[in-house]
Curated annotation (Swiss-Prot):
This is Large ribosomal subunit protein bL17. The keyword Ribonucleoprotein applies. PROSITE patterns: RIBOSOMAL_L17. It comes from Rickettsia africae (strain ESF-5). One of its GO terms (molecular function) is structural constituent of ribosome. Belongs to the bacterial ribosomal protein bL17 family. Part of the 50S ribosomal subunit. Contacts protein L32.
Amino acid sequence: MRHKIKSRKLNVTSSHRQAMLANMAVALVTHEQIKTTLPKAKELRPYIETLITKAKKADLMVRRSVLSKIKDKTAVEKLINILGIRYKDRPGGYTRIIKAGFRYGDLAPIAYIEFVDRDINAKGNIQQDANEEIKN
């Protein structure tokens, strides 16, 4: 029976999964949009949303708690100083997942995960990325 099992295994060990989620969270905070597989995006969403909810308080205890999760000082600074202020009035739902088809090699479902109200200059436009993939 699958009682009280919340997360996906993603076919990796637990330490690998935690490191992968932390690295993906740093990439998402830095670029505000990343392209990954759909199960990884679905696992990243609650992980990053709890970090943003904590970052809205912006005190020393929160800074240390977030730094213990993602281990990148510049990402923590952006999370607390920019994203925490940006989503101060939003009660949740800071990210969206956009399905983007299937990967060519193994037909894995691909998705973009991005922040709602994101800074477009931080990464790029999804439509431009899709047009570049079609050209290549």
